[in-house]
Curated annotation (Swiss-Prot):
Binds to the 23S rRNA. One of its GO terms (molecular function) is structural constituent of ribosome. One of its GO terms (cellular component) is ribonucleoprotein complex. Keywords: Ribonucleoprotein, Ribosomal protein, RNA-binding, rRNA-binding. The gene is rplI. It comes from the Bacteria. Disulfide bonds: none annotated. SUPFAM superfamilies: L9 N-domain-like, Ribosomal protein L9 C-domain. This is Large ribosomal subunit protein bL9. It comes from Azobacteroides pseudotrichonymphae genomovar. CFP2.
Length: 147
């Protein structure tokens, strides 16, 4: 019996896989537990169409991320911070300040997509990493100045 898995099943397959199982396992366990459906011709056609739509959606997301990455390549950021007389910042610069500065430039990015490799405690030039997509990661330079 062939079934289409609706979720990942250990030692059998992943979601949307078409697998062959014994009749009893399919009828008595997988289908009643809503882990699979019978793989009829119509179910296979619906699955194929859903997979095509998912691929189109993922391509659009990746294209949008690439467009945003190209836009971000031309942006330079300057972040002001309160400092002591010898140039040490009170507090530190985090991804929140970088996200706020990008928002001022007209680019809305979630702060969880921004990562800084080091703690920024002094005035100077640094880089932040933006993970826009699993395949698109860019570094944005920014400068910290005294207010």
């Amino acid at each position: 019996m062939q079934v289409i898995l609706l979720e990942n099943v250990d030692k059998l397959g992943y979601k949307d896989d078409i697998v062959t199982v014994k009749n009893g396992y399919g009828r008595n366990f997988l289908i009643p537990k809503k882990k699979a459906i019978f793989a009829s011709k119509t179910a296979k056609k619906v699955l194929a169409e859903n997979l095509r739509q998912q691929v189109r959606k993922l391509e659009k997301i990746k294209k949008d991320a690439q467009t945003l990455a190209n836009k971000l390549m031309n942006i330079s950021l300057t972040i002001g911070a309160k400092t002591s007389s010898n140039g040490i910042i009170f507090g530190s610069i985090t991804n929140i300040q970088i996200a706020d500065e990008l928002a001022k430039k007209g680019v809305q990015i979630e702060r969880k997509l921004i990562s800084i490799k080091e703690h920024i405690k002094e005035i100077g030039s640094y880089k932040a990493t933006l993970r826009l997509h699993k395949d698109i990661v860019i570094d944005i330079p920014f400068e910290v100045i005294a207010e």
